[in-house]
């Protein structure tokens, strides 16, 4: 029996070779492979196949806790269609689900039984939960904003709206680190806290790693001197944790070459590598071409629009405790906001030279816009630069995989947590996001945290069905009680991980970061460009390997007003 492609897609979602648009962008995804079996698809509902003795085995007991059926998976590993099995909060298997007594080709681990729940994803997209590595923990209100955007892991530093936290992503000292870990214990996300890395004292930094910091942050407002950089990286090497850096905008303790020299070819994660958010003016962006640097961007400059420059000056004055009445403060602010380097930042993302996107939450960046702005850049670059190498006029899979890697697998690798999160792969935590294709990147439908639904777009709770308006994000059972702790984790250093849970009396599991010191740009998935980046100190013109970068601001972006009328 044959049915039309249109009818098949309406019942089971698109299949191999079918194409679809991401939200209202010009990005077109093409399904590379379909792991389901035509005519044997698992589908739940009245008169459908997932019933006892049909696609549900009447005898199976040890089965997946949840199976997501017929999902379109968009991941750095590929764009494909499959069923996803989840057990004990982790991805158990990806492939074809069903009853092996009746159907050949059932993937091991995807047998459906009486102990299996079903989430129907026909025609919908599944991605890994986003990872934001640049969080200023200023306000707890950021948590729900991030979660409702599709972010499931938040990494950074801070202690609330203290002046230091407003400007820098550091949680300084054992007591502050302990209190922050305890404070997020009932929140349905993974967290990691970075200690203050600005010290010439090895011991002062060691104490923070032993207290539970997952890494260290160097920030110019605390003094990112070559000696502080060297000391911080020495501690990181000894304890296998990552160092993030916001370099010296004013070039007080040396120019960018002095900072790179202090790295001594050791691995480091550079924040807002373009420089509008901070860093050696005007040429910090050079570091994005180095083999030992893991470069990231923050979202306020992404993508470059006609309003970017004007918005940034006021933001910068507030975030860094500057005064418009002090000429030196105004000069400091103006030195960081450069249209040509901001324009070049988008191109560096498209080339894979900048590997990671993040927010810089409430400190010049927007915590709920990491994902949306990443895709806006991808759209803008397709409009300006055309088809990416390896793609064709009918699909943009290579570009799509490059950009999704920027907020999933690459931040995970940079922070040493890719064994646990960052992609849709067997064995990893089931931190997954379900999207309607028309709302992809803008408004997720369901956020699954550790295999359990934590947040969802939900209608009136007094209605007779789940869908009546008002539809809004509401916390689900995965966010309540002890479930939130059981389905999420705290990332810490190895040295702190063994006894931290009992020491602090927390319910979240504690996992150690790993393999942060033996990696480099070559490990950044689909974003591993290494080359010579030059910035003219007078004109701010940018060249890559001697070739000038050309890019303009855009006047309109997708994924914007039409999605936020209500």
From Swiss-Prot:
Segments crossing the lipid bilayer: none
One Gene Ontology biological process: urea catabolic process
Naturally occurring in which organism (per UniProt): Aliarcobacter butzleri (strain RM4018)
GO cellular component terms, A-Z: cytoplasm
High-level lineage: Bacteria, Pseudomonadati, Campylobacterota, Epsilonproteobacteria, Campylobacterales
Residues annotated to bind substrate: 219
Domain Urease: 129-566
Cofactor: Ni cation
NCBIfam families reported for this sequence: PRK13207.1, urease_alph
Pathway: Nitrogen metabolism; urea degradation; CO(2) and NH(3) from urea (urease route): step 1/1
Keyword line: Cytoplasm, Hydrolase, Metal-binding, Nickel
Gene that encodes the chain: ureB
PTM annotation: Carboxylation allows a single lysine to coordinate two nickel ions.
Name assigned to this protein: Urease subunit beta
């Amino acid at each position: 029996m044959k049915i039309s492609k249109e009818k098949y897609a309406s019942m089971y979602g698109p299949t191999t070779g079918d194409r679809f648009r991401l939200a209202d962008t010009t990005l077109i995804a093409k399904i590379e492979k379909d792991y389901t079996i035509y005519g044997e698809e698992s589908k739940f509902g009245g008169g459908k196949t997932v019933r006892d003795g049909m696609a549900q085995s009447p005898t199976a007991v040890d089965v997946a806790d949840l199976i997501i059926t017929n999902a379109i998976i968009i991941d750095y590993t590929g764009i494909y269609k499959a069923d996803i099995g989840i057990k004990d909060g982790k991805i158990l298997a990806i492939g074809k689900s069903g009853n092996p007594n009746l159907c050949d080709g059932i993937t091991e681990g995807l047998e459906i039984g009486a102990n299996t729940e079903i989430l129907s994803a026909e025609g919908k997209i599944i991605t890994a939960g986003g990872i934001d590595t640049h969080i200023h923990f200023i306000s707890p209100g950021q948590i729900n904003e991030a979660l409702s955007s599709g972010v499931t892991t938040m990494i950074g530093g801070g202690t609330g709206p203290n002046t230091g936290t407003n400007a820098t992503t550091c949680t300084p000292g054992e007591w502050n680190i302990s209190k922050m870990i305890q404070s997020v214990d009932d929140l349905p996300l993974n967290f990691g806290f970075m200690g203050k890395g600005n010290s010439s004292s090895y011991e002062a930094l060691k104490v923070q790693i032993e207290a539970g910091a997952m890494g260290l942050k160097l920030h110019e407002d605390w003094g990112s001197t070559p000696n502080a950089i060297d000391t911080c990286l020495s501690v990181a090497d000894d304890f296998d944790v990552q160092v993030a850096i916001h370099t010296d905008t004013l070039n007080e303790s040396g120019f960018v070459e002095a900072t790179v020299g202090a790295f001594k070819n050791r691995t480091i994660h550079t924040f807002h590598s373009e420089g509008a958010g901070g860093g050696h003016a005007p040429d910090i962006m050079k570091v994005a071409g180095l083999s030992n640097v893991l470069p990231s961007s923050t979202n306020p400059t992404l993508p470059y629009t006609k309003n970017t420059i004007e918005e940034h000056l006021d933001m910068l004055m507030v975030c860094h405790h500057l005064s418009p009445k002090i000429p030196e403060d105004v000069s400091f602010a103006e030195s960081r906001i450069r249209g040509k380097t901001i324009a070049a930042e988008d191109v560096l993302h498209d080339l894979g030279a900048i590997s990671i996107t993040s927010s810089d939450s409430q400190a010049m960046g927007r915590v709920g816009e990491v994902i949306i702005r990443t895709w806006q850049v991808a759209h803008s670059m397709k409009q300006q630069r055309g088809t990416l190498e390896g793609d064709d006029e009918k699909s943009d899979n290579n570009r799509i995989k490059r950009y999704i890697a920027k907020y999933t697998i690459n931040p995970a690798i940079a922070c040493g947590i890719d064994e646990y999160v960052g992609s849709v792969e067997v064995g990893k935590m089931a931190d997954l996001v379900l999207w309607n294709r028309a709302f992809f990147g803008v408004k997720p439908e369901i956020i699954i945290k550790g295999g359990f639904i934590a947040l969802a777009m939900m209608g009136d709770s007094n209605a007779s069905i789940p869908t009546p308006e008002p539809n809004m994000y509401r916390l689900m059972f995965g966010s309540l009680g002890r479930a939130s702790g059981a389905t999420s984790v705290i990332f810490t250093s190895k040295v702190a991980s063994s006894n931290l849970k009992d020491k602090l009396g927390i319910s979240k599991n504690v996992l150690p970061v790993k393999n942060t010191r033996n990696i480099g740009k070559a490990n950044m998935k689909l974003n591993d460009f290494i080359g010579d980046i030059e910035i003219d100190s007078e004109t701010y013109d940018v060249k890559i390997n001697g070739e000038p970068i050309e890019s303009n601001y855009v006047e309109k972006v997708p994924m914007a007003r039409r999605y936020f009328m209500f």
